[in-house]
Regions:
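N-terminal pre-domain/capping segments
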Residues: 1-88, 112-113, 119, 163
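Active-site acidic/histidine proton-transfer and metal-coordination neighborhood
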Residues: 65-166
Length: 166
């Protein structure tokens, strides 16, 4: 059996957010949310909805040291919120995104050092997730259409194309 989720950010937009969540849950779907810092978490808990995923950080990025420190620090905050919501998955985007979904600090060329930093950051997040009983998911955002400058997107796609399938 499988379950489907609907992103509360994208549907019933004329309604207050908590009502969107109630409607989605009432239709039998799990709920995805994005910027939890702008939400009344206790009101979301009271909806009784099942949350499938949420954004797993507030600021920061995977590929530079300063951004990585910030990403891990805010991921710890996200884990605490996920626990309150019973949300098992937290999304990452490789970099902080603004309100339009664009990178706060666009990166158009990723160096080897940046990949190593991203690897170390993901390793730290994996440890955090394991301790907290949640899974961090790296979302491969579309750079060609609506998320240019996300540092991990292009390479992740090329890795997939280059894999040998047996």
């Amino acid at each position: 059996m499988f379950a489907l989720a609907v992103c509360a950010e994208m549907v019933f937009r004329a309604l207050p957010f908590e009502e969107r969540v109630r409607r989605i849950a009432g239709l039998g779907f799990m709920v995805e949310i994005w910027d939890w810092t702008a939400k009344d978490i206790e009101a979301l808990v009271r909806t009784g909805a099942t949350f499938s995923s949420m954004t797993g950080y507030i600021t920061g990025g995977l590929a530079d040291e300063a951004g990585a420190q910030d990403l891990v620090r805010t991921a710890e905050q996200a884990v605490a919120v996920a626990s309150r919501l019973g949300c098992p998955r937290l999304n990452l985007h490789g970099t902080g995104l603004d309100s339009r979904g664009l990178p706060v600090t666009p990166v158009h060329h990723v160096t080897g050092a940046m990949w190593l930093t991203a690897y170390r950051t993901l390793d730290r997040l994996a440890d955090l997730g394991e301790r907290a009983g949640v899974t961090f998911c790296l979302e491969n955002l579309n750079t060609a259409v609506d998320h240019p400058g996300v540092p991990t997107a292009g390479r992740a796609g090329r890795c997939r194309k280059d894999e040998k399938m047996y």
